[in-house]
Amino acid sequence: MAWMIRDVPKDSRPRERLLSSGPESLSDHELIAILLRTGTKEESVVQLAQRLLRHFEGLRPLKDATVEEMTNIKGIGPTKAVQILAALELGRRIHQSGCADRYVIRCPEDGAKYVMEDMRFLSQEHFVAIYLNTKNQVIYRKTVFIGSLNASIVHPREVFKEAIKRSAASVICVHNHPSGDPTPSREDIDVTKRLAECGRIIGIELLDHLIIGDQKFISLKEKGYV
């Protein structure tokens, strides 16, 4: 018979602790244990949650796990895997929808905050354009391309076509460095200068080009390239 949360000592049960102290008081593995609900014949649900996190080396890799990868772990079937992935996806969508509600970008820090949680864990480079109105409110966001940044690939037409369509007053470009190091490359700088020049010609300003690393970023405007 599988171990369940009720089989854990009462003062250690995640559900009871959440009710008495709030969700913020629980550790990552305790929150996952609530989603899993049951353990295995050999271990409690809390122990299973701990093993799951150890296997993926924390929440960050777990966020990108597939159902197949999760079900390779003893004690994690399709139902448990789907429950965890659904919860992680809801968290991502809540964060995204909160930011998208006419988010105002007044400085590089605002822009980085808007995309950081979505982009800092990506395993490939994503080049994103954020379109703003005259009040610097976000009106649209588009992933222009996925792959290594190259001046021959990032064509200004693809960036500014959407800006014209959306009647945007300005645009902020963002891309991530999967290495976690946001230091700009020569290609990053060349692409930025090209986009800024095109923006000046058509009258839609490139406000900035942000490079996202792991919990850090660089503004190419602050570096003098815009």
Curated annotation (Swiss-Prot):
Q: Which CDD domains match?
A: MPN_DUF2466
Q: Which domain of life is it from?
A: Bacteria
* Annotated Gene3D superfamilies: 5' to 3' exonuclease, C-terminal subdomain, Cytidine Deaminase, domain 2
The record places the motif (JAMM motif) at 175-188
Extract the GO molecular function terms from the UniProt entry: metal ion binding; metallopeptidase activity
An example Pfam family from this entry, by short name, is UPF0758_N
Binding of Zn(2+): at which residues?
Answer: H175, H177, D188
Q: What GO biological process, any one, is recorded here?
A: proteolysis
**Keyword terms:** Hydrolase, Metal-binding, Metalloprotease, Protease, Zinc
Q: Could you list the residue ranges that cross the membrane?
A: none
Domain MPN spans what residues? Answer: 104-226
**Which N-terminal residues, if any, form the signal peptide?**
none
Against SUPFAM superfamilies, the record matches this protein to: JAB1/MPN domain, RuvA domain 2-like
InterPro entries in the cross-refs: MPN, RadC_JAB, RuvA_2-like, UPF0758, UPF0758_CS, UPF0758_N
Per the similarity annotation, which family is this? Belongs to the UPF0758 family.
Q: What is this protein called?
A: UPF0758 protein GK2618
What organism is this sequence from? Geobacillus kaustophilus (strain HTA426)
